[in-house]
Amino acid sequence: MAVYKVQVSTGQGSLAGTFDTISITLVGIDGESPKHVLDRYGLDFQPGSVREYEVPSERALGPILLIRLHKEPYSVFPESTWYCNEVRVTSPEGDTYRFPCYRWIQGYCTVELVESTAQIPSGDSHYLLQKYRRAELTLQQERYRWKEYIPGTPWCADIDSAMTAEVNLQYSFPKASAFFGRGLATLLESKLKGFLDRPYSWETLTDIPKIFWFYHSPVSEYVIEHWQEDAFFGYQYLNGFNPVLIRKCTALPENFPVTQEMVAGSLGESTSLREELQRGSIYLADYKLLEDIPTIEVNGHQQYVAAPLCLLHQKPSGEVVPLAIQLSQRPGPDSPIFLPSDSDWLWTLAKTWVRSSEFHLHEVSSHLLRAHLLAEVFSVATQRQLPMCHPLYKLLIPHTRFSIHINVLARTFLISSGGVFDRAIATGRPGLAELLRKGLENLTYTALCLPDDIQERGVGSVQRYYYRDDGLKIWAAIESFVSGIVGIYYQTSLSVQSDHELQAWVGEIFTKGFLGRQASGVPSTLGTAAELTKYLTMVIFTCSAYHAAVNAGQFELAVFMPNYPSSMRKPPPRNKAKVTLKEFLDTIPEMNTTSLILSVLWVLRNEDQDMRPLGTYPEEHFTEHGPKQLMAAFQDRLAEISREIEERNQSLALSYKYMYPPNIENSTAI
């Protein structure tokens, strides 16, 4: 008779425990034990508990390959979902085997858990483990199905409601409570103040901050004070919530006929536009993706979107300022070039049109497409193509946490027919769909890989570009961590090429996320460890640091709505006639539209509840010494980066904190 010691750990959450009967079967190389009920005096599987049991077997089982957990009814108690952290089995010889679970087990069922050592397919030589891998993937592919939500855009999980989503995809109770509680409180406040019921123009600019009078931060106060200044307008291209559009301009586009005479007053007598172009201090923001995007009516009135071109100059002081703005892609008498020398409110209106275009391009292409829809593609493909024992599953699963759930919520409340886009945003859902399609058609692998993106846009030497500076450090830290993991499990290029699970994962991302577009440069297969390292770094960076950069500052930079209008109620000006403040207020969104958009952005701020910062791995998917050492080194490097950012920010009038590692969540979870 052999007796095995079994230790079962239940999750900490208040709802993690169960009264159901839990039994176990041990499966080893030399046989399997009888099914054995795990039962001791008292309550066995309570939140936070670690309980030990003895499991007898008529004979020694040899090395333990996997275990089966059987969840069955207990007496008259109703079924309750159980969160199992892990199970440890110690053999009579003293060898300990770990079986990570870290998921909810719902319903009466049997769950198989494989021993924790990470293995690529060629490493699992025992037929039972090979059978387990195939069975797990078959089950996962039935559980996680794809669907096409908007033709021509990335596919998504076939889930219609967050309430019906598989329990392991859903927000934790603390996160869900905080998320929905904040949303209800925000809408209630706006309703009580009456803003949601007022489809009227703002009477004064000073009334706008009253929507959220309780919220003040150094950034929001700075925006209110400086929103009209050219230097702050330019600053946001580098360190706002869409820092990926600006690019070096070495020759003016043919459709943007800016002349030396137009910009001489801005550049000064000591230089010229040609000299500044040659020097590399001229930059361009081109919103051509917005050309011909359809718009809708809001509050019974037609809305408008522009596709502007904005020329920018970095002064010797480091400030980036706008030189010229054209509000369409077609130059001509009806599309004048606006200049800082124009009348105050005309120039402010031109810049506000650009900021409104920034809203659409940022929210749809930079944020929704690149940070959310791609994160969901990575998440679904990981669940479908990589078994739990695969080292890449263990590496990636923390970076997919809640990504599917937040996107299901977005499809329910934000981008659905009749959702926020149809109620408060100029493009509505039809324009959103078209912009998503155009965004994906123009998205490249280069743009997704930060070092390549910086080089391609020619912005490596721009001063005061903190998104770039912090982002490159974080990219390098992730890359070093990933390279170490890849080096442990893939010693040769052949081991990468022959990993059919890895290749299926990459292939599915290519076909479902990028629709098989070879012009994107996104790989459909991977052939070397270096290629794999770069690809994995891109995935983790996108789901964590990139999402933080384009999400975290939305509310505080937009809380003063003229800095980020979701719609414009009059067409772009076709001449340089003087503009009054009243005309400006009659162009930007009404009170109820402003209130709804700000309420949504408030809810979508980074959620403190159950937030896991980048590099935090409370669940031990990896149990080997090598990966643990790499995790510790990764965390140490992130701590160094944090200290460097803290020191830098002390000298800045406006701190850049969106790429501060403690503020970056491991996954696209909000």
Each predicted region: which residue ranges?
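Long, compositionally biased charged/polar stretches
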Residues: 1-670
